[in-house]
Design a protein with these regions (language model features):
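NAD(P)+-binding Rossmann beta1-loop-alpha1 motif at the extreme N-terminus of oxidoreductases
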Residues: 1-50, 54-56
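Hydrophobic/aromatic beta-strand patches that form the interior of the parallel beta-sheet core
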Residues: 30, 49, 63, 91-92
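Short, conserved loop/helix-junction motifs that constitute active-site signature segments
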Residues: 80-86
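Conserved small/polar residues in nucleotide/adenosyl-binding loops
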Residues: 94-96
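Rossmann-like NAD(P)-binding element
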Residues: 53-79
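Short active-site oxyanion
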Residues: 24-28, 59-62, 87-89
Length: 96
């Protein structure tokens, strides 16, 4: 599986490290706070994504590790930029 993370705070950072340490394929991170995504990508040996859409395309499982108050906004962004994206990419979403 290819795991991607939208959000690179404590939860995304830690979960990505756990997966990477257990030989799982962490493809990378996207965050509105670039520095956090860059740091998380370095820490997990993965990639920093400047573009959320590219991370979606490269992932099979997408962890949404953003604050609860941001989920609706994030969902609307994903829907508007990726028509039929769940079927096209066979993608699973998980919010933690």
């Amino acid at each position: 599986m290819k795991f991607g993370f939208i959000g690179a705070g404590k939860v995304g950072f830690s979960l990505g490290k756990y997966l990477a340490d257990n030989n799982q394929n962490v493809v990378g991170y996207y965050s509105i706070i670039n520095e956090e995504a860059i740091e998380a990508a370095k820490f997990t040996g993965s990639k920093y994504y400047e573009n959320m859409e590219q991370l979606v395309e490269d992932s099979e499982v997408l962890f949404l590790t953003v604050p609860d108050g941001q989920i609706e906004n994030l969902w609307n962004q994903l829907k508007s930029s990726h028509k039929n994206w769940m079927a096209k990419y066979n993608l699973s979403l998980i919010h933690i």
